């Protein structure tokens, strides 16, 4: 009786959400609440629902896709790689909707092993993003104003079809890891040597801070990169991960 009474009180009074948030206390196991209650930001949910819809993924609602971590009602981390296990998606993601730009509190995005060919212009809104893993897709490029992702620390673009990098990449002052191996790059912006990246070293887990092997770089290569001990490094696509 006490539990039933508490539930009724919660639903009628305590658990009402602020405007713009939706209450849901029946969550699947793939949802992690890092901090907060069961109120979820509507715009974040819209981005998830649109991602499901445009790719014809078989999920009942926005909470079904991937592994999601929420912080005070905002989507903080989304793991939606096509790994072939329950941590990612149950089918391939081919495109990202403009509404992913709603995820303005997102800090980690994992989209490996899909078939994504481009990033929507709204991607520039993800200013809190610290980790972007989108290897093993079919990206031909990235957003021009990449510097809008000013908090980016980890950027994995390996195993795509990228043929050119925007100059704006040089303004990513917080970037520590940059993986560009196995793309179609034939040239690089000269300003890359102004970036605060350790071009030749590995971290404590033996991952290189920078790697760019498997491209078509032959001439007009910035000196910091041509002299890098990791110039020809390419990690095995089936075994590496920062996760």
What are these regions (language model features)?
Residues 1-19, 133, 156:
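Bacterial Sec-dependent N-terminal signal peptides
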Residues 13-98, 206, 214-243:
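N-terminal capping/linker segments that flank leucine-rich repeat
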Residues 72-74, 102-105, 124-129, 146-152, ...:
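Leucine-rich repeat
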Residues 78-80, 109-111, 129-134, 153-157, ...:
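Conserved hydrophobic beta-strand positions in leucine-rich repeat
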Residues 90, 101-109:
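Extracellular repeat-rich scaffold modules on cell surfaces
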Residues 91, 114, 134-137, 157-160, ...:
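Consensus "Asn ladder" position of solenoid repeat domains
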Residues 96-101, 119-122, 140-146, 165-168, ...:
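The feature encodes a structural signal of leucine-rich repeats
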Residues 156-159, 163-203:
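Ankyrin-repeat and related helical/solenoid repeat scaffolds used for protein-protein interactions
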